[in-house]
Amino acid sequence: MIMKPILIFLGIILMFIGFFMITLGMILPSSQENYEKPETEKTESSVEYSGIVMIGPIPIVFGNSPGLMILSVLIAILMIIWMFLFAFGIRIK
């Protein structure tokens, strides 16, 4: 399959825009000057998180919420199926 030059050019431009936005976000000061609340106003907050790290076809799922971990496992299974479909050249029509 031959790539059209315009698609290659657009891909490169999008990568440069992404790098520029990340760099700009790190350089510009944040809108919050004081990151810590005063001692009297500190409250406990429960943040739930979960994530997936793919090392090749092997997923590593982490998190602190059982519900989000199950969702992450399901997403990891879908990602593995997606990778195998592309690796073996199976086309969905």
Swiss-Prot record:
* InterPro entries the UniProt entry points to: DUF131
| Pfam families tied to this protein | DUF131
**Which residue windows are transmembrane per the record?**
7-27, 70-90
Record keywords, A-Z: Cell membrane, Membrane, Transmembrane, Transmembrane helix
Which top-level group of life is the source organism from?
Answer: Archaea
Lineage, broadest ranks = Archaea, Methanobacteriati, Methanobacteriota, Methanomada group, Methanococci
What protein is this chain from?
A: Uncharacterized protein MJ1617
Instruction: Tell me the membrane topology, using the record's own terms.
Output: Multi-pass membrane protein
Q: Record's GO cellular component, any one?
A: plasma membrane
Q: Does the keyword DNA repair apply?
A: no
Native species of this protein?
Methanocaldococcus jannaschii (strain ATCC 43067 / DSM 2661 / JAL-1 / JCM 10045 / NBRC 100440) (Methanococcus jannaschii)
Where in or outside the cell is it found? Cell membrane
